[in-house]
């Protein structure tokens, strides 16, 4: 029977990040295929295609994009792998950010034809702030791509991280035939077995005469020159990888499966076991026997048959046991975590035990908030909070059918508690007519879709001219008596805090100037 140390040591928990359409969800599918978690992979797009395993919400299946973060666990090669498949669409940075807080490393998927794109830069910066290992998979080598060396140089120039090519592509587009493994000094030649099945593989040495028959003399000579050029460059440095200053680069095609298995094997070999975490009581060692975890995501209605709400927890230390008693630090109460389960998109499996590095979902009757800490009784430390992004777009929202007020209030409360949207109301009023704030406008579409499909409520929505939110930190009197200007509005959040929405920076200056004693805090303070 494996010891606690051995179980934690074999955990690998990572997030996959990319710009939209770089192939991130397809790569996730192929990891599951090679890991044996699914028998046959489905592509994300195409009218006749199978819906992607990691895309569970109906709107995701319709649009072919990931709009929530999926959590998937599977076993492969002695490792227990937890994949956090993050939203690639630019509008979903908030959910993505929280997911990255739960990862020990990140896989950055880059389109070989397009290189580093805006969303890639944004997500990379979040990873870099945490100094976690970042691996690069240059995808779509089965299409015409840019020069591989040029792509590596662009990653270094645009993202400020060194790179080391772990393998090197042989051809591109229709001529993409395989990769050269620099460590093992051999060619991995691929044959197409159909996109849904594992690619056929032949391994052959660079000096084997049979190689010419496989790839041709010219391509063999070009490869030898490229390998020599790579040899004159940077050395591989494992410590630099672990510190997040050197990114190992792999090439392949998630669609055809070429290069996926070498990448998965190399990644698992190089990346880290669960990392230690900062708390207000110091560093918490992942290998400590005492259980601890934090809530990084809340999701309602993952399965319409259940009509439930799950809190996703990243276990940071020790071992979780189903029937044990735990302590909710923010709630200041002991509890047993109900219906603990691991995920494969919307598929669930009840777990009896889990270890540091694992992600578990527990039934949440409404007591958890994002960022909450759970420990063993007697421990009261807190992990660092997970900030929310300041909403940049606002809409006035109300139900078209006033008879569905109860369903409307339930829906907005549950979806708001998930953190993807912010809900505000007018002071001294109920939630029949609310203001919804989001980071990106696509979240309005998802919100409207979910309210109709999950709660049976059609919405009346109208855009509002606000751009900023400020928290009232100090006010000499009743906030309703403040001198407001055009383009500003007093609001209240779920916690009862008073905020002011502004149409621009000028409005902020006007209010502070004409209301002596008024002190406003920015959104970073609000979110703590």
Residue ranges with predicted function:
Residues 1-528:
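Structural and coupling elements of P-loop NTPases
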């Amino acid at each position: 029977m494996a010891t606690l140390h051995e179980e934690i040591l074999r955990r690998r928990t990572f997030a996959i990040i990319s710009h939209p359409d770089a192939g991130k969800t397809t790569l996730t599918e192929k990891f599951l295929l090679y890991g044996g978690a699914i028998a046959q992979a489905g592509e994300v797009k195409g009218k006749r295609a199978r819906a992607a395993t990691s895309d569970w919400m109906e709107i995701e299946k319709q649009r072919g994009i990931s709009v929530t973060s999926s959590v998937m666990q599977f076993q492969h090669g002695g490792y227990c792998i937890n994949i956090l498949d993050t939203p690639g669409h630019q509008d979903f940075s908030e959910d993505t950010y929280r997911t990255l807080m739960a990862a020990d490393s990140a896989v950055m998927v880059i389109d070989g034809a397009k290189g580093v794109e805006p969303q890639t830069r944004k997500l990379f910066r979040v990873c870099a702030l945490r100094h976690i290992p970042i691996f690069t998979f240059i995808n779509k080598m089965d299409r015409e791509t840019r020069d591989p060396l040029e792509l590596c140089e662009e990653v270094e120039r645009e993202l400020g991280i060194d790179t080391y090519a772990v393998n090197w592509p042989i051809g591109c587009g229709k001529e993409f035939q395989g990769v050269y493994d620099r460590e093992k000094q051999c060619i991995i030649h691929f044959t197409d077995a159909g996109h849904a099945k594992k690619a056929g593989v032949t391994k052959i040495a660079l000096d084997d005469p049979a190689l010419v028959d496989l790839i041709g003399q010219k391509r063999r000579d070009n490869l030898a020159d490229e390998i020599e050029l790579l040899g004159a460059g940077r050395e591989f440095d494992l410590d630099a990888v672990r510190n997040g200053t050197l990114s190992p680069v792999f090439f392949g095609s998630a669609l055809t499966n070429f290069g996926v298995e070498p990448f998965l094997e190399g990644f698992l070999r190089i990346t880290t076991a669960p990392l230690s975490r900062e708390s207000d009581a110091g560093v918490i060692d992942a290998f400590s026997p005492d259980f601890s975890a934090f809530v990084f995501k809340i999701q309602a209605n993952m399965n319409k048959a259940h009509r439930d709400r799950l809190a996703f927890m990243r276990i940071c230390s020790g071992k979780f046991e189903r029937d044990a008693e735990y302590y909710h630090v923010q709630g200041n109460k002991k509890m047993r975590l109900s219906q603990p389960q691991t995920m494969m998109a919307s598929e669930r499996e009840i777990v009896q035990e889990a270890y540091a590095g694992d992600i578990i979902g527990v039934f949440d009757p409404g007591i958890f908030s994002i960022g909450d800490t759970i420990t063993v009784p007697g421990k009261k430390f807190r992990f660092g909070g997970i900030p929310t992004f300041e909403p940049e777009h606002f809409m006035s929202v109300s139900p078209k059918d006033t008879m569905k007020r109860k369903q409307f209030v339930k829906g907005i409360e549950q979806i708001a508690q998930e953190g993807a949207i912010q809900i505000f109301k007018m002071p001294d009023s109920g939630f029949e007519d609310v203001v919804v704030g989001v980071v990106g406008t696509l979240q309005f579409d998802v919100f409207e879709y979910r309210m109709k499909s999950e709660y049976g409520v059609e919405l009346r929505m109208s855009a509002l001219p606000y751009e900023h939110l400020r928290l009232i930190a100090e006010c000499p009197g009743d906030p309703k008596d403040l001198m407001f200007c055009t383009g500003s509005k007093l609001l209240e959040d779920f916690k009862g805090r008073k905020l002011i929405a502004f149409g621009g920076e000028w409005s902020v200056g006007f209010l502070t100037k004409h209301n002596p004693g008024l002190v406003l805090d920015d959104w970073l303070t609000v979110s703590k």
